From Swiss-Prot:
Signal peptide location: none
Compositional bias (Basic and acidic residues): 18-27
Protein name: ATP-dependent RNA helicase dbp5
Catalytic activity: ATP + H2O = ADP + phosphate + H(+)
Keyword Transmembrane helix: no
Residue interval(s) of motif Q motif: 78-106
Protein source organism: Aspergillus terreus (strain NIH 2624 / FGSC A1156)
Membrane topology type: Peripheral membrane protein
Oligomer and partners: Associates with the nuclear pore complex.
Residue ranges constituting the Helicase C-terminal domain according to the UniProt record: 295-468
Gene: dbp5
Length: 487
């Protein structure tokens, strides 16, 4: 499909040519994709999310009981009926179009549902059914027999952002829709001081700081909690402040609580932390070499400076609205400025950053899910876990980088890049990611990303916007089986 390949710029025409020799700067061809996409299979199709599309991979299990055989049939299940679930939960699974367990669920569910409860540290990419796995475990352990227990917190799910928390609530609502008297509470930063005097819910989903505050103020009573789940656990434990907040929350909970950590990525130091956070846990992982982001065409555009970045973005606007698109920028200020300029020029865009109040953030993400807003400008608040089925393009307006002291060379943030581009190409569909490069530092960071993931990010020549449009439209509209990636 040569017509889809970006055209190489004449010698001296691209940023790469200006910085280094073409033969040295051109990345080696590779069909291997970055490891893992960091997404959460959170939003059911009824809420604008994606249907489960299971990739090929193998699941490895390491049991805390070293004498036990992880390949024992007791530690695997081929259908939901074999788990002895409440028929009403089976109805909920059917409503989610879950006909049989995914590979992750085959191994995770027997471990999660075992009695006495055991801790679990699970690493799995998105689209594997991990959200449904921990929600199913929670619903199976609830006691809803009395009004008092219906209003008593029995399970707590912690998420790094308000948006992911709301998405998880949506999964619980769909899977638990046939359970009478199921009450779900949210503990996220409030816009005003309108918190309830008491948290009366059997399942609570929230962010660490708000949950800790509600427990300390006795708004939420943790005495009857049976299950603690950390979703996007690597983000929670690795992000400055959130890791400490998680520790403080856990210290306020019953010692017998079942701790479950699920995430798409577990860097070594975070895995060590997680092992302490969930001691004597069963471990479940995907074979690392098979964790890939498939179906994402990775491209980059040369820009002469910051202003040229903006002009390029405006030129891309028509393509951004083919489906839905997310534009990732470095700072809240950049997001606001770009939104203001584009709206003034008559373009329909929305922005979502951590600085926006809660209810407004909810409204923006709901509009984006519904398709009322097709272009969303955001910081890394959306880089993880949000599943919106219509996203076909991601723009790295600013290449993600680690926060390092000013005197150190700029370093690309590989995990954030992975999570960002994972917003597109969701569950079997084709997507496009485009990175803007405007200076030597950004070019170096792009090269770091290519080398780290052993992949090729192709350059598009912006001299012919008709050709750019043709390349991207053909890629988006192609079924994944017909698309070419990393070539």
């Amino acid at each position: 499909m040569s017509s889809e390949q970006p055209t190489e710029a004449p010698a001296g025409g691209s940023l790469a040519d200006r910085i280094s020799k073409p033969e040295e700067s051109k990345p080696a061809d590779s069909t291997q994709q970055p490891t893992d996409n960091g997404q959460t299979d959170g939003a059911p199709a009824q809420l604008g999310g994606s249907e489960l599309h299971e990739p090929e991979y193998n699941v490895e299990v390491k049991l805390s009981d070293l004498q036990a055989d992880p390949n024992n049939p007791l530690f695997s299940v081929k259908n939901f009926e074999d788990l002895g679930l409440d028929p009403r939960i089976l109805q909920g699974l059917s409503a989610m179009n879950f006909r049989k367990p995914s590979k992750i669920q085959e191994r995770a569910l027997p471990l999660l549902l075992s009695n006495p409860p055991k801790n679990l540290v699970g690493q799995s990419q998105s689209g594997t059914g991990k959200t449904a796995a921990f929600v199913l475990n929670i619903l199976s352990r609830l006691d809803l027999s009395t009004e008092q227990m219906q209003k008593t917190p029995q399970a707590l799910i912690l998420a790094p952002t308000r948006e992911l928390a709301r998405q998880i609530v949506g999964v619980i609502q769909v899977m638990g829709q046939f359970l009478d008297n199921l009450i779900i509470g949210t503990a996220v930063p409030a816009d005003t001081n309108n918190r309830p005097a008491r948290m009366e819910a059997s399942v609570v989903v929230g962010t660490p700081g708000t949950v800790m505050d509600m427990i300390k103020k006795r708004i939420m009573v943790p005495a009857k909690l049976q299950v603690l789940v950390l979703d996007e656990a690597d983000n929670m434990l690795d992000q400055q402040g959130l890791g400490d907040q998680c520790i403080r929350v856990k210290a306020l909970l019953p010692r017998t609580i079942q701790v479950v950590l699920f995430s798409a990525t577990f860097p070594t130091h975070v895995h060590q932390y997680a092992s302490k956070f969930a001691p004597q846990a069963n471990e479940l992982t995907l074979q690392h070499e098979e964790l890939t982001v498939e179906g994402i065409k990775q491209l980059y555009l040369d820009c002469s400076d910051e202003e040229d970045k903006y002009r390029t973005l405006v030129s891309l606007y028509g393509l951004l609205t083919v489906g839905s698109s997310i534009i990732f920028v470095k700072t809240r200020q950049s997001a606001m400025e770009i939104e203001k300029r584009m709206v003034a020029e008559g373009h329909t865009v929305a922005s979502l950053t951590g600085g926006i109040e809660g209810s407004q953030r909810d409204a923006v993400i709901d509009q984006f899910r519904a398709g009322a807003a097709k272009v969303l400008i955001t910081t890394n608040v959306l880089a993880r876990g949000i599943d919106v089925s219509t996203v076909s393009m991601v723009i790295n307006y600013d290449i993600p980088e680690l926060h390092l002291p000013p005197n150190q060379p700029r370093q690309a943030d590989f995990q954030t890049y992975l999570h960002r581009i994972g917003r597109t190409g969701r569950f079997g569909r084709v997507g496009v990611s485009i990175s803007f490069v405007s200076n030597r530092d950004e070019w170096n960071m792009l090269n770091q990303i290519q080398k780290y993931f052993n992949t090729s990010i192709q350059r598009i020549d912006t001299k012919d916007w008709d050709e750019v449009e043709d390349i991207i439209k053909k890629t988006i509209k192609n079924p994944r089986s017909q698309a070419t990636f990393g070539k």
